[in-house]
């Protein structure tokens, strides 16, 4: 779909298909903020009891409970009417089998992981499209070099992989005689479009960050530090471009104030 993912189309789809025996919809977006905004808009229109949210910024306990809930809702045998809105946290490790998927575009490997959360077992009869991919994404998600953008690299999706991924899906759509994408189709797209020659051609005159350059920079860094005694924090600085700060919600902090104070006092006493 040549558009940005939006609440209106998801709500419209939900309402039009309300008579289905099972209407389990998984919505996957690229940022926590997008997930939160979609949740607010969709839950306002169809009710909070039918919409749930999962992302990486929940407290450990809340996220554990939500992961249990989404796994239960996402079981093949559970027929429900529910919309789950999530980020990349559902791409791996969670065994989910939803009826429909609405997703923002990401590079192909991430996109295929998301697709695997819809009709996972391949046992559901499919008479109409069950996966909707929205090609347009916010420009701020595309990787930019540090120069002119502060001390940190901006974005986390490589422009070259984004453009080649779209080209791969367009070619598949034009050439296939089936509306079902096979595992062989996915492998062929990766091999044909995510190769060095095509990536370099896209990046030749691009102002965006170079996937090829970053790949070899990190490879050289890995060779450099192999065998060295290096701390986890240093490893993350070398290979992880996302900067975040852990925080405790105020009400959680106050509920555990005595315990936290006791631990702090024990630490101070040992110094």
Which ranges hold each PLM region?
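Conserved phosphoryl-transfer motifs of two-component systems
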Residues: 100
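Generic beta-sheet signal
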Residues: 23-27, 52, 80-84
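Short loop/helix-cap segments at secondary-structure boundaries that form the rim of catalytic
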Residues: 92-96
């Amino acid at each position: 779909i040549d558009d940005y993912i939006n609440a209106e189309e998801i709500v419209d789809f939900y309402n039009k298909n309300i008579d289905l025996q099972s209407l389990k919809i998984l919505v996957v977006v690229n940022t926590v903020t997008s997930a939160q905004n979609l949740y607010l808009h969709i839950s306002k229109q169809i009710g909070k009891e039918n919409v749930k949210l999962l992302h990486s910024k929940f407290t450990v306990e809340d996220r554990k409970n939500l992961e249990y809930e989404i796994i239960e809702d996402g079981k093949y045998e559970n027929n429900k009417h529910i919309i789950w809105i999530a980020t990349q946290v559902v791409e791996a490790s969670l065994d989910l089998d939803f009826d429909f998927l609405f997703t923002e575009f990401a590079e192909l490997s991430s996109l295929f992981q998301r697709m695997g959360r819809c009709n996972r077992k391949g046992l559901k009869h499919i008479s109409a499209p069950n996966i909707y991919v929205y090609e347009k994404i916010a420009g701020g998600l595309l990787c930019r070099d540090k120069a002119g953008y502060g001390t940190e690299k901006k974005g986390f999706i490589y422009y070259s992989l984004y453009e080649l991924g779209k080209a791969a899906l367009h070619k598949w759509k034009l050439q296939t005689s089936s509306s079902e994408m096979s595992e062989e189709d996915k492998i062929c797209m990766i091999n044909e479009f995510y190769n060095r020659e095509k990536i370099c051609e896209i990046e030749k005159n691009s102002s965006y960050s170079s996937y090829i350059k970053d790949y070899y920079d990190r490879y050289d860094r890995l060779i450099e530090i192999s065998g060295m005694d290096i701390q986890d924090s240093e490893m993350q600085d070398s290979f992880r471009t996302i900067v975040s700060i852990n925080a405790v919600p105020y009400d959680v902090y106050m509920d555990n104030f005595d315990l936290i104070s006791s631990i702090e006092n024990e630490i101070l006493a040992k110094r």
